Structure formats: C-alpha cells, structure tokens
C-alpha cells in the first residue's frame, strides 16, 4: 500500500490549490482550433508531499513539459482557439496516457524512482484517475461534440515539449510533429516551418 503521506484525497486540497484543469473558451464560437496542454504544470497537492521526490527532480522534465503552457497560451491567443490545460504534475497521473498504460502512474521517470507510485493501491489509483484524468478528458469530449454538432470540424493541437536527452539518447530534432492518420494539417505545417528555416530537423 502507498505511504499514507502520499495518499490523494480531494477533501484535503487547500482552498488555494487549483481545480484539476483550466479551460479557456474562444471568443469565436465557430473557431476550428482546439489546443490542449496535458503536461502544463508540475504542481502536486501539498498533502501528497511532492510524491516523495525532491523539488529539483520535480522541476525537471519528468514532472512536466517545460515551457509548454506558455507556448499553448500564446498559440491559443494567436488562433483565437479554445485551450484546456492540466494543473498538476504528470507524475500523479499522465493525462497523455490511457489508464491501462504502465506509465499512466509511473513508478520511475527517466531513472528517478517515484516513491508515491511504487506500491500504489487500486483505491488510490481510482481516486487519482477520477479526479485528475476522467473529468479532463470528458470536458475535451464535450467541447469537441459541441463543435461537431454545430458543423465545425475541429483541428486539435496538443502542445508538448521534450528534453534534448532522454535515457542517455541525444535527440536530434528541433521540433516533433506527431499525427495518426490525417495529414491535412501536419504536412503543410511542416512545409511552412522548413520554408522559414531550412536548417530545422523535424
């Protein structure tokens, strides 16, 4: 069972601690742009005692996507896009993982053990999932469903940042553009970025 000092309880959140996520709507109700920032923050509720790791470790890339929220906010402003961002560390639950993933609640992160997650109980996992993960994704679905009902085909831009070195591998890329099947947005974007700077590795 997880150490009691790390156990999450919504009732123990301080009045000064934020909701699990922040939503910014668009001034243009028919804007096609939808920006997400899953790993915007490295905040941990005070009663969870930083999950048992140091502040130095939490401030590394393992705790959040450094700089991602600033980019997401600026992009949202430029595009007049809706924005939803997570308000707590990815080490509590990873909003960019399915709940079945072994890294959904990581026991280690880039070589750093996360004591609060090593012997986590099913009850604790459920509490965290409902509070931090479920409502975040339900709100995304509701927003997208509303747009589609209004005849708007949304373009989702998920903002992340990545560390130049991960697990002793030096990543050569300046920018990563990930997509699943639909290339209508990502290929023109790649071409435009390379047009502006042909030295970029994408």
Segments from the language model and where they lie:
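N-terminal catalytic or cofactor-binding beta/alpha core of small enzyme domains
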Residues: 2-156, 161-202
């Amino acid at each position: 069972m997880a150490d009691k000092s790390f156990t999450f309880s919504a009732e123990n959140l301080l009045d000064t601690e934020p909701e699990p996520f922040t939503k910014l709507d668009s001034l243009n109700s028919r804007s096609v742009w939808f920006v997400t920032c899953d790993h915007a923050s490295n905040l941990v509720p005070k009663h969870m005692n930083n999950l048992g790791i140091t502040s130095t470790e939490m401030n590394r890339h393992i705790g959040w996507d450094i700089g991602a929220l600033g980019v997401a906010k600026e992009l949202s402003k430029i595009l007049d896009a809706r924005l939803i961002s997570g308000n707590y560390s990815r080490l509590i639950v990873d909003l960019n993982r399915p709940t079945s993933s072994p890294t959904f609640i990581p026991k280690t992160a880039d070589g750093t053990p996360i004591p609060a997650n090593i012997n986590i109980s099913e009850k604790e996992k459920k509490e965290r999932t409902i509070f931090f993960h479920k409502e975040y994704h339900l709100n995304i679905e509701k927003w997208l469903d509303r747009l589609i009902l209004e005849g708007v085909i949304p373009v989702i831009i998920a903002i992340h940042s990545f560390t130049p070195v991960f697990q002793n591998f030096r990543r050569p890329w300046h920018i990563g553009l990930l997509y699943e099947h639909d290339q209508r947005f990502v290929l023109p974007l790649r071409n435009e970025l390379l047009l502006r700077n042909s030295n970029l590795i994408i």
